Amino acid sequence: MVATILSPCYAQASEYSDYVKHSEATFVENGKKYKVEEDLISRGDKIKTTSNFFTDEGVLIETQITTVDRSVGIVYFENRNSDQELINSESYRFDQILELTESDEETHDVFVTYSNDRGKFLRHEEYTINLTGKKLTALVVGSILAGVFAIAPEVGISIGGKFVAAVTSAGLLGAGSIMPWNVRASVDVYSSPYRTGKHYTRFYGDFYTTDGEYITSLHWSKRGYH
């Protein structure tokens, strides 16, 4: 296991000073079924997530502990074996991490990215997204620093809070939809390993108005797509 699968309520934790959440999930890796039990605790500026990974028979494999301290801008990571012996521990500043969380658009699983290594460069893409008639749908998909919103789902793009603020200030955000508007996307595409035998295609996009005004930068992924 190289990444922590987070509960769908992870984004909410950053909005509350006192928040506790327990969640359970299963996943399949190399034909074997596994279970993860996760406890998330938010206290003030600290968000701690403890994830225990089990075999399908209930045998503990390993434990991953992630602590986000927003007061100092640092993420702490611990990995322990089935006997709870420390395997490794790392800490990263927020500015060292390309994205704190990454979401699989197919399964909506969310995992923490601890490295700014993008992987193998595949291609560069540029295109324009027409937002005419698109509804603005809030998706709680595990962002630590801000809620994530999905616009133009046919291209799998998640637009962050800065985008929403820009649209609102421009008077383009209605009660439930966005008035006609175009966004220009400049995207670098990479192939990056996730777990053993699996790869994710990672997208790093900069978004602009058609007049060239910068809006925001985003990071998303697709599993099993190249």
Regions found by a protein language model. Give the residues of each.
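One face of beta-strands
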Residues: S23-A25, V36-E38, T49-S51, Q64-T66, ...
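Cationic, glycine-rich low-complexity segments
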Residues: I41-L139
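Sec-dependent signal peptide cleavage junction
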Residues: V2-K21
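Membrane-interfacial hairpin junctions
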Residues: A152-K162
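Transmembrane alpha-helical hairpins and terminal membrane-anchor modules
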Residues: K162-N182
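Short Lys/Arg-enriched alpha/beta "domain-start" segment
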Residues: Y16-S42
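Short, solvent-exposed mixed-charge patches
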Residues: G224-H226
